[in-house]
Amino acid sequence: MTKILKYLKPYWLSIVLAFGLLFGQATCELTMPDYMQNIVNTGIQNAGIESGVYQQIREKTLNSYLMFANDSEKDLITSSYKLVTPSKATKEEKTEIPALKTENVYLLKDINEEKEEKLSSTLTLLQMTMVEVSKEAKEQNAQIPQLLMMNGVDAYRKGAKSEISKLGDSTVSSMSSQFLKKEYTDLGMNMEKMQQDYIIFSGLKMLGYALGSAVCAILVGFLASRIAAGFSKDLREEVFEKVTHFSNENLNTFSTSSLITRTTNDIQQLQMTIVMFLRIVMYAPIIGVGAILHVIESGANMTWILALCVVVILSVVLLIFMIVMPKFKIMQKMIDKMNSVVRELLDGMLVIRAFNNEKLEEKKFDQANSDITSISLFTTRAMAIMMPIMMFLMNGTTLMILWFGSKQVDSGMIQVGSIMAFMQYAMQVIMAFLMITMVTIMLPRANVSALRIHEVLSSEITIKDPSNPMNFSSSMRGVVSFKNVSFKYPGADEEVLSDISFETKPGETTAFIGSTGSGKSTLINLVPRFYDVTSGSILVDGVDIRNVKQADLRSRIGYVPQKGMLLSGDIESNLLYSKKDASKDDISNALSISQSTEFVSKKPEGIHSEINQGGTNVSGGQRQRLSIARAVVRKPEIYIFDDSFSALDFKTDAKLREALAKSCKETKSTVLLVAQRISSILHADQIIVLDEGKMVGKGTHAQLMKSCEVYQQIASSQLTKEELANV
């Protein structure tokens, strides 16, 4: 998988940008529970009072606190407030604080955060001291100053500190808020408006963060799609380019259906995984770690619940991953098998129908289909177990948080809003793992797909251009020499060709004939370097073909395969395939030589007539003639015909060979011709007779009829004595 991911390198900037956006999205998501907590704790429970420090306080209330304060506390309080009298108060101040119209009020100065915290704790202590004194005064029906003179302030301050330590921070904060709320009410302030303003302002902030999160998510989705699509495009191009450079040996390693699957299905699998990785896998750890940090900062003693849940989730994911990974590997191979069966069925449909074997092929397909269905059911069921388990864990975690959290709320350790925020963070942690779990469904298949693609990309090309290529001699043209050539297919024990030696001359035709399996097609496929010789050498124009570039070698060859192969497009595009800059005269001449002019001219659109993939909309003979015309357009030095006249009738065959021979004489082109019919090679300048990979005869027809027994047998099996005598 990691070897394939190197193709993401051109998109590193977009990936970094996506990561930054994910971080922004996570920040927005993690901020919203804090605002929800503040809305519940401060906005609802504390009536919008944010701080434990009085922003405004009446003079008599402040003086009552100073009764319980020591000298340093008095200095802190008096230095933090300024006295405003009704005569000096502004109109705005009187509107906001109606009590300023009739009595003196202290307003909080602009103090730093450290001093504000110290002031808050001091006021809380004084408030609790006042509660202690007031409680005893009520019990003894005495005045507060009287009690202070009798018992002293320190005794009550000590009791207040003890009470604060017993109560949780939540309870103390709530009690402090009640003092502030009462004071603000006595000041005539609109507490309902204060509460509404706080809730609305906090709610708008939440909406802003939600909008920011949505924008980040949309941008990440856009970037992820572009990165994955670009990655897939580059990878497909790389695979396609690699396959186009495969030798026949490499192509035999992978089936056609497998290469198609690897280029389409496997790369598509990786594309989907990259999108999910950028949108989920990268996001999940950010949101998960961030939520855990917020949980730890919250001070709630329930982190162990999350730790337990995470351990269980990881265990389940790893277990299922280990079970399904091998099955996904098998599944991809079965998809290859299915494609192979379908391809064979479609290619051989005429033969299947001719022998009434539709039922047999249906059984083959049903078997392949059943195998895929069986393993798909297994993997799908295994993965389907994940989601219910995760939902169960999520609900169980929620119940545990509520159970243990309610006890902490009851003891005053935390507030209700804090429990709600904790639940939100816990859900974010669990959802992060849930998202990763969803991706793990794709990761095993993606890993298998990556390995299969890497197999193609890492395959060593067996036929390569030399590091220091030579150039062809300008003094020679169309000379092909075989020198003690032997060849065997990779992995085979026996040689297909053994010690073959001959030489062709420009403008002459060299024909190859022999029984089926004698090595005729193999021999001529060595000339364009579709395979490399096992031993010996092949020279073209005096240069070993292994010492020149393949492109240079093949540019001198006009190759016509045994099975005429046309590409989708039209007749003209197929003919121009061998020489893009061919003129109209070149095309017309090629059609004439290949005896294609007549049937092409009869088509309504002429050479612009459409050709289906594989040339399925023309007859076999027409397909073969157009294949020959394509080679002729190039005007090559060397023609290679691999039994290319077998689909032609005798009359067309004779006309075509006559026209071709005339053209080759004019252009001094060499012809290498594989034939099954003696009649096609009677007038060849040189005939090579092959038998079981060995050259058993070489010469003209007349010479071979005298010297080669194998040739005599072939000739007598195809022609009568009278026909042979008249040759």
Listing of model-derived features with the role each one plays in the protein:
Residues 23-31, 207-218, 270-273, 277-289, ...:
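Hydrophobic alpha-helical transmembrane bundles that constitute the permease/transmembrane domains
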Residues 290, 294-311, 315, 321, ...:
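Helix-loop-helix
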Residues 10, 248-249, 265-274, 278, ...:
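An intracellular "coupling" helix at the cytosolic face of ABC transporter transmembrane type-1 domains
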Residues 28-44, 200, 209-256, 260, ...:
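Juxtamembrane helix-loop junctions of ABC transporter transmembrane domains
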Residues 44-51, 58-65, 70, 144, ...:
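Short intracellular "coupling" helices and adjacent cytoplasmic loop segments at the cytosolic face
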Residues 1-32, 38-206, 212, 216, ...:
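Membrane-integrated ABC transporters
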Residues 15, 51-54, 65-66, 71-73, ...:
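ABC-type nucleotide-binding domain
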Residues 220, 245, 252-281, 288, ...:
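Extended hydrophobic secondary-structure segments
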